C-alpha cells in the first residue's frame, strides 16, 4: 500500500487489509510506504489512528517509511492510492518497476475507473472517515477476489 507520505491513507490500507487477512486465516505480509520521505519514522496521523481504532484496528505501531525499488521485488502486489503516486513509484524504482504488480487500490472495486483515494491530509476528520470507507470496501474486494481464485485453484497459497 503506497501513498505520498505514509501517514494517512496507506497506513489505513495496511491496517485494514492485514486485519481482514487475519480474520480470513490468511498469512499475508501487508506493508505500506510513501513516495516521499518527509515523515520517515513517524506514526500514522492521529486522525487515521482514531478512525482505524473506531473500527477495532490499531495502527499506532506503524512507522512511516519511504517506498524503494526493493519493494517492487519483495511484494507480489502493490496498491497505490493515486495516479501521481504510481508515477513517483515508477521514477523511484526505474528498471525495477513492474507494472504487472502495481495498480490503483480502487481498481479492485471499480475496475478500470482509475479512481484515486483522496488525501485527507490537512482536512477535517470526516475526510478520514470517507477514506476509511473507500479503503474498507476496496480491501473487501481484494479478500473476496482472493477467496474466489483460491476456490477455483486450491494450489494457491494462503
Placement of each model-derived feature along the sequence:
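Phosphate-binding/catalytic loops
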Residues: 77, 83-158
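Conserved active-site segments centered on acidic
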Residues: 1-74, 144-153, 157
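Short beta-strand scaffold positions
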Residues: 1, 80-81
